[in-house]
Amino acid sequence: MMKKIALGIGVSAMVLLGGCATESSRSVEVPKVASYNTNYQGARSPISVGKFDNRSNYMNGVFSDGVDRLGNQSKTILMTHLQQTGRFNVLDRANMEEIKSEAKMAGKSQQLKGADYVVTGDVTEFGRKEVGDRQLFGILGRGKTQIAYAKVNLNIVNVRTSEVVYSVQGAGEYELSNREVIGFGGTASYDSTLNGKVLDLAIREAVNNLVTGIENGSWKPAQ
């Protein structure tokens, strides 16, 4: 009899737990460069994106597998932000074989454009840290903050002369905080998305500075 009661309680608990499951989703607005959708009447200049390397100490230690994930991620972010400025036609050099194959399948001859300038980039600083605090020796709660910092350099290189005609930098910091009060509240686990967020912020700032340089006449892309 007791076994049947225990079994019934177990089944009821599973049903209740299953009934408590919730699912939610929402779209998140993606930050864009300052010049996105601004009124610009000028011509878009063709520009190519060259190497984007991770020159920081992050993921570059003796135990690194040699794959530059930070640099590859940064290059993808840079191409998107450059295109969204409305000042450039970004030339894709990373998928040449795929583009060639697709053109062949479509029976079309390629008419590739050249660029007078190449943008190269480096992640010069990148780091993460966690800081915590306790209030009244932890009796009133404790907190933990994850902080990610990134700094990038962008260089505009003349393809004919190899001169660096203009340079900009961008830096950003992201943090995630969580506080637990007298045993209540969540704990902030490691959030790997902070890497992408802080890279996006730093590169976006550098691209904004690049556009500002065009607008104040510091450099002029080829028309």
Residue ranges and their predicted role:
Residues 46-53, 77-81, 89-91, 116-124, ...:
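Soluble periplasmic/extracytoplasmic beta-strand elements of cell-envelope proteins
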